[in-house]
């Protein structure tokens, strides 16, 4: 189980540090979205999952006029396959629905993330037909 809290300057620094290392070592990850992550932190839309007082994952989301989107969700490579991503996602979904969002969207990039989001109830978005090589757009409607 992780504690999920709005980011602090310290947790932001920790996230950016491991994303930069991941980019350098593997050429993968979300360090390319550094400015989005910092802007989301400044707007209070970056939430970090902590275990043993260390950031093990984070989620960036934003509320729009009617719906909301989860823009980035990543779990530190050393902490994957422990359910932390599901905890971050369900916490973000609950928070967004509690603010009145009628739906939450995600863009599956990489496409290998699609089964994860579908396991949480997300379905293809009709307004974004899936095309080969492009990210899949999924939506989860608030039925409450």
Model-assigned labels for residue ranges:
Residues 1-31:
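Short amphipathic alpha-helix that is part of the acyltransferase structural core
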Residues 10, 55, 65, 111-112:
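Short alpha-helical
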Residues 22-51:
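Active-site rim helix/loop that mediates acceptor-substrate recognition in acyltransferases
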Residues 48, 54-62, 67-74:
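Conserved beta-strand in the GNAT
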Residues 50-52, 140-143:
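Active-site beta-strand termini and strand-to-loop segments that position acidic
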Residues 75, 81-94, 119:
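Conserved acetyl-CoA-binding loop-helix of GNAT-fold acetyltransferases
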Residues 96-109:
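Conserved GNAT acetyl-CoA-binding A-motif
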Residues 110-134:
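Conserved active-site alpha-helix within GNAT-family acetyltransferase domains
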